[in-house]
């Protein structure tokens, strides 16, 4: 059911599960769409997860106090920022690989003010159609190569560039909302 920020986020139970899977040689994954990442305890847990072998994708629009891609520390963490014409406030948490995958929609960013001083919630998603939609949305955001910027180990954001078909996640979702995607 519905869980408060202290239980779901700060205690980091879900990441601990993924760390255990990774240490057992199993595939382990976590994905997050947030506006900000500043909470030191969560950052420390993300680093521990990366060191254990958990693959972590993060879409963080704004403040981010974690440097990804540092060998031996955060090399399993990828962080991108997408800033487009729409101000987004959605938060998605994904834990687990394949059949173990769990999805949450949440109100909290990973900021101390949200995890300690505010009442925030994360709601599990049980409906398979909604799970599929959340994964599709997350995948589109990760494939954005127009507005996305990737945070590198040098602490700088660099344009995501590739030779693939141009993808602008916000424009994709806008068009999809109006049934313009073929």
How should these model regions be labeled?
Residues 2-9:
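Short, small-residue-biased leader/transition segments that mark boundaries at the very start
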Residues 10-182:
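PLD/PLD-like phosphodiesterase catalytic module centered on the HKD motif
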């Amino acid at each position: 059911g519905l869980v408060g920020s202290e239980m779901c986020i700060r205690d980091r139970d879900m990441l601990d599960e993924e760390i255990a899977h990774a240490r057992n040689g199993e595939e382990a994954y976590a994905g997050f769409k947030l506006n900000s990442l500043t909470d030191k305890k969560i950052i420390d847990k993300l680093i521990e997860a990366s060191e254990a072998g958990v693959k972590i994708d993060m879409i963080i629009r704004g403040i981010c106090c974690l440097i990804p891609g540092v060998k031996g520390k955060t090399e399993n963490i990828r962080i991108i920022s997408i800033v487009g014409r729409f101000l987004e406030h959605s938060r998605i948490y994904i834990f687990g690989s394949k059949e173990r995958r769990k999805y949450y929609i949440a109100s909290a960013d990973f900021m101390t003010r949200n995890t300690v001083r505010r009442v925030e919630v994360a709601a599990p998603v049980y409906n398979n159609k909604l799970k599929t939609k959340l994964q599709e949305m997350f995948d589109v955001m990760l494939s954005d190569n127009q507005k996305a910027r990737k945070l590198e180990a040098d602490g700088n954001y660099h344009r995501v560039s590739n030779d693939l078909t141009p993808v602008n996640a916000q424009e994709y979702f806008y068009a999809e909302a109006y049934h313009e995607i073929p």
